[in-house]
Amino acid sequence: RDLHSFPTRRSSDLNPTVEAEVTVKADGKAGELFTGTAIVPSGASTGQFEAVELRDRDDRFGGKGVQNAVKNIDEEIYPALEGVNGLNQRKVDAIMIDLDKTDNKEKLGANAILAVSMANMKACAKALNIPEYKYIGGITAEKMPIPMMNILNGGAHASNNIDVQEFMILPVGACCFKEGIRWCAEV
């Protein structure tokens, strides 16, 4: 297993965000290596029960830097996962959760943990030559997940008086993900 973090990525709102890259070696494939990457941008607001996105809270980027989260990947998460079979996603995730030891992921940062977990999932799906949704849902998963799209915002950070934070639509019945995206775009 090889794990890298990249501290200079930016999300769509130009805030720094965490990117992780995980490389796994597939058994029985002549030592072939498979790499997955994942970027974890932040939302505009967080609820009181959400996992904590670790931000630096210093002068850089208005306090929204992610150097501490990246440092946690490099110095705590990577050593804890070194030698662990990445194909056991539950074990990979359990190790990170146990390493954090908080209910809301405030020690390592949910952004660090999620980036590594997603990158591991993507690398392992490639190694097994299966779609990511089958890696997550099991090889008996018959349907690919459908997209959820936000069509109207309200709540504390909106410029209206709607109490509901998000109104979302799901293209239930679309034949494929691409068709679901089209249906939502046409709404």
What are these regions (language model features)?
Residues R9-R10, S42-A44, D98-T102, G138-E142, ...:
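Acidic, glycine-rich active-site loops and adjacent beta-strand->loop/helix elements
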Residues L33-G43:
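A short, surface-exposed beta-strand/turn
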Residues A125, I130-M148:
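Glycine/threonine-rich beta-strand-loop-alpha-helix active-site module
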